[in-house]
Amino acid sequence: LQSNFVDLGFRLNIISQEENLLSEQFDLTIFGSTIQYDKNFLTGLNSRNLHLGDYVLFTHTPLSLEKPFVSKQFSDYTGLQTIHSFEDVSKVFEKLGYNLIFKSTLPPEGASVEDEYTNKTVYANLLFTKLKN
């Protein structure tokens, strides 16, 4: 029998159903390589703003250095992905009261975009923090 309890030295709840988010407050919200599968991610954030943590982390996320675009993905998933622009993501989070405090890039082949988009794409980690009033 496998235990579901792991002592990390702090409380950890993992919630994967959006309806369960309504009654919770979070320190950290993690989007791990997911936003490219939701073409309306940025426009839908306003309705989810109250449910984002004080910190928002994007990991292994392909972002456009120019305008957003749609590309085929070449990995285990072979469908379409919407590559949101770094500028749009930054602007939306600024409007929501967040500040970008960390960014890093990963090897570009991880973005798995069509060849014509490779030079326009960065595969990134971003960390935003909620500004205090």
Predicted regions and their residues:
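A conserved beta-strand element that flanks and buttresses the S-adenosyl-L-methionine
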Residues: 29-30
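Short alpha-helix
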Residues: 79-106
